[in-house]
């Protein structure tokens, strides 16, 4: 090797592979108000130190790669790199840690959940040095929140639009979810709405199939809404699912819904994607439509305790991307949801300021700086006997959605809707009178059933129905 070549090698950058923790593990770092903070549940491979695992997460989800590159010298890594600033062992687990990572705000495009997730939950989840990785929570700084529109309208504006106050809203998913013709589908909608429900809903997998094209469904559902409104004197709605194969087709369906004059449309935000969801949310804000969000596919992402992403993160992302309702579990029905954890992310959806509370899975204090709230939807295996618990757990600002619990009534859809409305009104009145629904709920329902034959029939049908499985969504 010539002396000239040796000189260049000695003054050049130090090529090769070095431990991530030398650059990305910084326990002395003081987080900034503008940082996005993440709490990851990290399970390192055997022999990988926790500091190296946490640093690898910070590196691979920000500026790092597997080897040193000369272009590191063309930027300021100290300004742009993610930092693992704290590690704590998970109680009861041998080799599992909560790694806290801080990301500088400049790493993310303004107003883009898509870009935020591409970095934070991107390729790092396939990293070989980690046996498993789960994103438990995010702290979104106020400076980043202010770059998002958020929900098209929010809870208070929705109540004003519907002129409904002081109680939860009632909904129903039309069943069978697939196979009905548009006219029969519209008939089912009408029967439910005239019986006393506020909303009916397209199932998440109803889009535009051969047995029922979307335009036909929209027209017959609009007819059902107007007829039910005329008969009851109440504002009614049906969640018309605008989810489609392209953003252009999705917006076309939303435009047609607006032209029909209906109050609300629907989107499957995970299968449709965050870019499509934000696009639709902006359209709904500009055109006065409420937006109902279904979370189909969420359990693929959030149900495994050690890998993936907790639903509280998906809930925060939805509030940023935009939606007025989102399904959030029931605690008491057939779908997943442990009480304190569910109420933790329900608060993250509805409230403006949420304190850190590890007992409910909330790792960071979150300030939404007046971004409108999202109404949680309780849906899945619920019926009239659950009404006291649901009213007690969720309070007024929620949608209680009974699909089979309405349509399965032995006398038909309208009596099923009557039963649910009577049960709800009885529970709200009892609560307002100071009665303890958790203790006296069954008695409240029995008393109401004495003067409502529809409720009495529903109570008889579902008196033995329970879904007693242990939740896997635990701390």
Curated annotation (Swiss-Prot):
CDD domains attached to this UniProt entry: RuBisCO_large_I
Subcellular location: Plastid, Chloroplast
A GO biological process held by the record: photorespiration
UniProt-recorded Gene Ontology molecular function terms: magnesium ion binding; monooxygenase activity; ribulose-bisphosphate carboxylase activity
SUPFAM superfamilies tied to this protein: RuBisCo, C-terminal domain, RuBisCO, large subunit, small (N-terminal) domain
PTM field: The disulfide bond which can form in the large chain dimeric partners within the hexadecamer appears to be associated with oxidative stress and protein turnover.
Comment on bound cofactor: Binds 1 Mg(2+) ion per subunit.
Protein name as annotated: Ribulose bisphosphate carboxylase large chain
Record-listed substrate binding positions: 123, 173, 177, 295, 327, 379
Domain of life: Eukaryota
N6-carboxylysine modification, residue list: 201
Main location: plastid
InterPro entries in the record: RuBisCO (IPR033966), RuBisCo_large_chain_AS (IPR020878), RuBisCO_lsu_C (IPR000685), RuBisCO_lsu_C_sf (IPR036376), RuBisCO_lsu_fd_N (IPR017443), RuBisCO_lsu_N_sf (IPR036422), RuBisCO_lsuI (IPR020888)
Subunit architecture: Heterohexadecamer of 8 large chains and 8 small chains; disulfide-linked. The disulfide link is formed within the large subunit homodimers.
Additional detail: The basic functional RuBisCO is composed of a large chain homodimer in a 'head-to-tail' conformation. In form I RuBisCO this homodimer is arranged in a barrel-like tetramer with the small subunits forming a tetrameric 'cap' on each end of the 'barrel'.
Organism for this UniProt entry: Welwitschia mirabilis (Tree tumbo)
UniProt similarity note: Belongs to the RuBisCO large chain family. Type I subfamily.
Gene Ontology terms: cellular component: chloroplast
Catalytic activity reported: 2 (2R)-3-phosphoglycerate + 2 H(+) = D-ribulose 1,5-bisphosphate + CO2 + H2O; D-ribulose 1,5-bisphosphate + O2 = 2-phosphoglycolate + (2R)-3-phosphoglycerate + 2 H(+)
């Amino acid at each position: 090797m010539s002396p000239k070549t040796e000189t260049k090698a000695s003054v050049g950058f130090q090529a090769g592979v070095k431990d991530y923790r030398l650059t990305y593990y910084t326990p002395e770092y003081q987080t900034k108000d503008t940082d996005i903070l993440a709490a990851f549940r990290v399970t390192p491979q055997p022999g990988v130190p926790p500091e190296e695992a946490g640093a690898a997460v910070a590196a691979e989800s920000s500026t790092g790669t597997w080897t040193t590159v000369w272009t590191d010298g063309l930027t300021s890594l100290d300004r742009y790199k993610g930092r693992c600033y704290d590690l704590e062992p998970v109680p009861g687990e041998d080799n599992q840690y909560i790694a806290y990572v801080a990301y500088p705000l400049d790493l993310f495009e303004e107003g883009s959940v898509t870009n935020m997730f591409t970095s934070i939950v991107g390729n790092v989840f396939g990293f070989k040095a980690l046996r498993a990785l789960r994103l438990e929570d995010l702290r979104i700084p106020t400076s980043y929140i202010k770059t998002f529109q958020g929900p098209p309208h929010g809870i208070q504006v929705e109540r004003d639009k519907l002129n409904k106050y002081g109680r939860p809203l009632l909904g129903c998913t039309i069943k069978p979810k697939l196979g009905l013709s548009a006219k029969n589908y519209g008939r089912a909608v009408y029967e439910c709405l005239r019986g006393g429900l506020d909303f009916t809903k397209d199932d998440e997998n109803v889009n535009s199939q051969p047995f029922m094209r979307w335009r036909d469904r929209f027209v017959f559902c609009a007819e059902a809404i107007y007829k039910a409104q005329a008969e009851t004197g109440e504002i009614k709605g049906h969640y018309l699912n605008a989810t489609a194969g392209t953003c252009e087709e999705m917006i076309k369906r939303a435009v047609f819904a607006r032209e029909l004059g209906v109050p609300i449309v629907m989107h499957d935000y995970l299968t449709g994607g965050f870019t499509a969801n934000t696009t639709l949310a902006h359209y709904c804000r500009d055109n006065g439509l409420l937006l109902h969000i279904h979370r189909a596919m969420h359990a693929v992402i959030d149900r495994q305790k050690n890998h993936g992403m907790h639903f509280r993160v998906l809930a925060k992302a939805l509030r940023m991307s935009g939606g007025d309702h989102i399904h959030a579990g029931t605690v008491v029905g057939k779908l997943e949801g442990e009480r304190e954890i569910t109420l933790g992310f329900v608060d993250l959806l509805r409230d403006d300021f949420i304190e850190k509370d590890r007992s409910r899975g909330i790792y960071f204090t979150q300030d939404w700086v007046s971004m409108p709230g999202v109404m949680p939807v309780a849906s899945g295996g619920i019926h009239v006997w659950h009404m006291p618990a649901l009213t007690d757990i969720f309070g007024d600002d929620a949608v209680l959605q009974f699909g089979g619990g309405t349509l399965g009534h032995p006398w038909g859809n309208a009596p099923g809707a009557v039963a649910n409305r009577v049960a709800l009104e009885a529970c709200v009145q009892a609560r307002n009178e100071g009665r303890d629904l958790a203790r006296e709920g069954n008695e409240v329902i029995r008393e109401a059933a004495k003067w409502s034959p529809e409720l009495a029939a529903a109570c008889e049908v579902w008196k033995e129905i329970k879904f007693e499985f242990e939740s896997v969504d635990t701390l």
